[in-house]
């Protein structure tokens, strides 16, 4: 687990906040969830914090033992950007495909949402904004949680 955290720290240090929306894409209006999350830079910081929390979370870290963290980071940023109404388009697998065979429980899905909320707290995201995002993400559990 310590090795996972060290690898994660190293990768995040290399990535920084290098990604940004293409200038030609329209920006969401002020007051949108995307803007309230701090735009792409804010979402990137939240995802970085989330990945650090996952590395320390004994409830779920085992699901990420073989993860490609660069790909995971990019896909989480795209997904949160898309779900918040930002100018991104999620390019990853469907939630059902991405989580097939992982046997994720409802409590593990909830643990991930808790880690996300803690990462948003750390970034100073307002509680009302956090609730709006989490409300949009909870339905994804239907395709993530093993049935």
Model regions and ranges:
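Bacterial N-terminal signal peptides
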Residues: 5-15
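Core of compact, soluble alpha-helical bundle domains
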Residues: 17-147
